């Protein structure tokens, strides 16, 4: 057997971004980022983490929000100081 046969074929990677949301028609997506973060945690609080439509909000905030913001918001939620009701 050759060395190439021993290696697995590379996995196909598909790149996707968030679709259009009529609530946020402008190019500045900061509000869309923040609202998707809030919507995700409200959704899993109401329906549970296994509820598939909640994943749409997760993908939105993971795609739009800088990770530093998400880390800070996670910390604020844990401390009870998050600036919006969830």
Swiss-Prot record:
Residue positions of motif Cx9C motif: 33-43
Keyword Cell wall biogenesis/degradation (UniProt): no
Keywords carried by this UniProt record: Disulfide bond, Membrane, Mitochondrion, Mitochondrion inner membrane
Stretches assigned to the CHCH domain: 30-73
Gene Ontology annotations of biological process type: mitochondrial electron transport, cytochrome c to oxygen; proton transmembrane transport
Role, per record: Component of the cytochrome c oxidase, the last enzyme in the mitochondrial electron transport chain which drives oxidative phosphorylation. The respiratory chain contains 3 multisubunit complexes succinate dehydrogenase (complex II, CII), ubiquinol-cytochrome c oxidoreductase (cytochrome b-c1 complex, complex III, CIII) and cytochrome c oxidase (complex IV, CIV), that cooperate to transfer electrons derived from NADH and succinate to molecular oxygen, creating an electrochemical gradient over the inner membrane that drives transmembrane transport and the ATP synthase.
Name under which the protein is recorded: Cytochrome c oxidase subunit 12, mitochondrial
Species of the source: Schizosaccharomyces pombe (strain 972 / ATCC 24843)
Gene (name only): cox12
